[in-house]
């Protein structure tokens, strides 16, 4: 019996020690769970408005919401909390003096979904600054002094839905955040209002789905006035997008150092916006989106004949794929107005799209290339021919023989009726006209033995000309045509 009593006493002693340790641990936990200058309520810790220069240490690991706003925090280092806060989903750091955040500052809070860094003194968002926050859904960075946003600052944040960057000094539109929807696929709100944006990537903005444009806020920026900008926001106004409808008076642009409302650009002679129809040609493959203002809506398409378009393509070549209208090969009878009825949990929307079909096919790329090539070759050949005509003289034909001197009789008929050569020998002396350069055209004069009209006088004979030099003029044939009216010189 004695051993049993000793064993029972030992068990009682161990139980007492265990209970004592449990109470001590619970008391210690109650001390750690609520740091000084903080208000604790279950898993919520509020340390706001305490003028804290540093984050309180020994934060309980079960903390789900930590409020450190309205304090004097200036730096958020990598070791700001020695405890890994895996249960923390909301961290409030607004209205502090933060000007530095370590790239490893968010390693202890991997499951954070809500982060408020607004109203601080941040200047730069470095690359991979938030890459450890892969579960983050809402990020508030408004009312800082941000000038530079690195292109990789928001890497690996596939769950981010709302990003607030308003009231900063950003001058470059971070197009990488929205282009193609790959970096932030769930982003539905991007607030860039009240910054220093002057130019927008209009082409990329036009391609965005309506549910992204609906939450893209760009008001209160000194945008450069342009008709393309007017067309962009007019389209958003036509679609009744919240980003435009809620801030119409604050959407302005800058021209000649003056602000103008974007929707009053009459002095630019901008064309009035009209919703354009889709255009297609015979045989084209076409996809028309049901561009709703919300994601995840159920979509139903109705054809111009008021029939529902099914995914199996019961209406000819038309079918529905992933909520979009798909035409395998466009036909003439496919033209008309299609209506998309979109239904969501809290919002319904109706969209109408007009399709115009042209009754011909477009030339292929190969034909277009051939036409352009032919035109180019024709132009080059034309230029070459013109250059040859202008600058290259005809070649002398060396195959022709040397011409023999013609006889006097042959020359009589081919002699010129008008001659610029004086009818005297320039080598003879004693002539009054020697040295006098008079340009006179003569008809062939009559010979000394000729009578009127070049006829021979009776008893006279025709003198034979002597061999002379080049300057000696040959006598004309008395029966030649050139002897007619031969006595009168013509002065030129």
Swiss-Prot record:
Regions of compositional bias (Polar residues) in chain numbering: 407-423
Family statement drawn from the similarity comment of this UniProt entry: Belongs to the immunoglobulin superfamily. AMIGO family.
Lineage: superkingdom: Eukaryota
Residues in the signal sequence: 1-27
Gene name linked to the record: Amigo1
Glycosylation sites: 72, 269, 315, 348, 359
Segments passing through the bilayer: 372-392
Organism (species): Mus musculus
Annotated spans, Disordered: 404-492
Protein name: Amphoterin-induced protein 1
């Amino acid at each position: 019996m004695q051993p049993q009593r000793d064993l029972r006493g030992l068990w009682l002693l161990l139980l007492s020690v265990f209970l004592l340790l449990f109470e001590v641990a619970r008391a210690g936990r109650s001390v750690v769970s609520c740091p000084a200058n903080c208000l604790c309520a279950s898993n919520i810790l509020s340390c706001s408005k305490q003028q804290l220069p540093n984050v309180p240490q020994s934060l309980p690991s079960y903390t789900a919401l930590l409020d450190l706003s309205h304090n004097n925090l200036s730096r958020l280092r990598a070791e700001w909390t020695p405890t890994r806060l895996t249960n923390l989903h909301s961290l409030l750091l607004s209205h502090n003096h933060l000007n530095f955040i370590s790239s490893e500052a968010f390693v202890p809070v991997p499951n954070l979904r809500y982060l408020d860094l607004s109203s601080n003194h941040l200047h730069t968002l470095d690359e991979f600054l938030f890459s450890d926050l892969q579960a983050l859904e809402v990020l508030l960075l408004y009312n800082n002094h941000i000038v530079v946003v690195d292109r990789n600052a928001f890497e690996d944040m596939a769950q981010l839905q709302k990003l607030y960057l308003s009231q900063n000094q950003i001058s470059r539109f971070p197009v990488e955040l929205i282009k193609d929807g790959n970096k932030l696929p769930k982003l539905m709100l991007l607030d860039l209002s009240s910054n220093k944006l002057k130019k927008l990537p209009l082409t990329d903005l036009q391609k965005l789905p309506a549910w992204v444009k609906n939450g893209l806020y760009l008001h209160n920026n000194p945008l450069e006035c342009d008709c393309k900008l007017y067309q962009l926001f007019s389209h958003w106004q036509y679609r009744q997008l919240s980003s435009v409808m809620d801030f119409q008076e604050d959407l302005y642009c800058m021209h000649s150092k003056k602000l103008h409302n974007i929707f009053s650009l009459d002095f630019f002679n901008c064309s009035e916006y009209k919703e354009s129809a889709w255009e297609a040609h015979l045989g084209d493959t076409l996809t028309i989106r049901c561009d709703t203002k919300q994601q995840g809506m159920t979509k139903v398409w109705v054809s111009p004949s008021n029939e529902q378009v099914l995914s199996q393509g019961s209406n000819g070549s038309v079918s529905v794929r992933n909520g979009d209208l798909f035409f395998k090969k466009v036909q003439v009878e496919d033209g008309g107005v299609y209506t998309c009825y979109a239904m969501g949990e809290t919002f319904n929307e109706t969209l109408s799209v007009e399709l115009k079909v042209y009754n011909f096919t477009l030339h292929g790329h190969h034909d277009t290339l051939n036409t352009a090539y032919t035109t180019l070759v024709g132009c080059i050949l034309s230029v070459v021919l013109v250059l040859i005509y202008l600058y290259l003289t005809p070649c002398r034909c060396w195959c022709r023989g040397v011409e023999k001197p013609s006889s006097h009789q042959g020359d009589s008929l081919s002699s010129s009726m008008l001659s610029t050569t004086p009818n005297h020998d320039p080598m003879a002396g004693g002539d009054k006209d020697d040295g006098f350069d008079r340009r006179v055209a003569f008809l062939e004069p009559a010979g000394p033995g000729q009578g009127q009209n070049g006829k021979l006088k009776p008893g006279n004979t025709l003198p034979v000309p002597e061999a002379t030099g080049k300057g000696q003029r040959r006598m004309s044939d008395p029966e030649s045509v050139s002897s007619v009216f031969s006595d009168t010189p013509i002065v030129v």
